[in-house]
Amino acid sequence: MEEPLKYFLERTTPWGTLARAHRQWQLRKKYRRWKEAGAVPPLPNWGKQQVVIKYLREFAPAVLIETGTYKGKMVYAVMPHVQEIYSIELDPTHYKNARRRFAGYANIHLFEGQSGDVLPGILEKIQQPCLLWLDAHWSGGSTAKADLETPIMQEMECILSHPCAARHVLLIDDARCFTGQNDYPTLQTLEKYILASQPNWVFEVKDDIIRTHARRSSDRQE
């Protein structure tokens, strides 16, 4: 797909650096307002991006896999922090827009379809630890609805059976939705399922994001 001139200039000229800085300033401003208003979930985009970047820096995986591209804001934010990005989007319009947005980046790989169906094929080709940002769920508006409101258990099945599963880092958005309704397991059910496969992992919820991965020395000290 041909890269639009706007995105080509953003990618190859100093204007792109300024545009990125301006976007980050706008997002930080919204985040500060959210904090001042009481920090009621969900976490704003800038906050989510900073969480993912933090874990990319701590664990240093070469690959990030995202389920739920939406408008590509997470992909755009983490580009400087990881070598390869794979992102899956169910909605055809969002997928097409993302392909145009990232057409000039050889290290960004976009896929259309249900993440529970597409993710196994991606993982089959990647024989190394990944950070997985799991955000593929129906949330109204322009988001697409698949057979299930969330494919999280399908995703878990293929992720935890991957040869490098023990070294993956999983960040799952919208922890508040894990109530046992609308195809979501409860947090307790999800924790039990994950730790049955990876008993040496931590499982914690903070800022509406489930964070589960191998224990670090800092985790053992807590």
Where are these regions (language model features)?
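A short alpha-helical cap/connector motif
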Residues: 1-131, 137-222
